[in-house]
Amino acid sequence: RDLRMSRGLGDVYKRQWLACLRWEGDGIEGDSDGDVAAHALIDALLSAAGLGDIGTLFGVGSQSDGAGKHGAEMLRTTVDYLNERGMKPVSASVVVIANRPKIGKHREEAERALSEAIGCEVSMTATTTDGMGFTGSGEGVAAIADALVEPVDPSTRQAV
């Protein structure tokens, strides 16, 4: 079985959207919805498939194809892009690095939203930096994602 794995690190944003869910709190600064978890997952998926990164697929800046788009929509576009090129997600995980928001009570809902967007199981965990740095002071949120993909027949989307 030809499995490929990679890691993605999302750009750092003030939070509003995270793991395809709307969170209470400060707004975001980003070209799309600023969903750092979704963006890290996109980078991991594309990198594992050898297809570049989020900027390769969507472009960068306010004029990019991702401008104004929701993280779930961008994830679905990414999976379609992988499928068309003979790859599909097998599993993924996302680690959110932040003191706020607290992920625990919404973790299962976030996992479901991410899993539905990419069509495979996604696990999510969170950690803090114990008050250190911009994530510790609540100025922003970071995320790291790992993704496992496998080759598929583009016409059937079945593993080869």
Each PLM stretch: what is its role?
Residues R1-Y13:
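Single conserved hydrophobic/aromatic residue that forms the stacking wall/gate
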Residues D11-R22:
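Polyampholytic, low-complexity intrinsically disordered segments
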Residues L21-S32, G61-G66, G131-T135:
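A short glycine/serine-rich beta->alpha loop
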Residues G30, G34, A38, A67-G71, ...:
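Generic structural signal for well-ordered, non-membrane alpha-helical segments
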Residues A37, L41, L45:
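Active-site His/Glu-centered metal-binding helix of metallohydrolases
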Residues A44-K88:
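Glycine- and Gly-Pro-enriched alpha-helical subdomains that act as flexible
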Residues A92-G136:
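Short, conserved loop-to-beta-strand elements that form functional interface hotspots
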Residues T135-T156:
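C-terminal edge-of-domain segments
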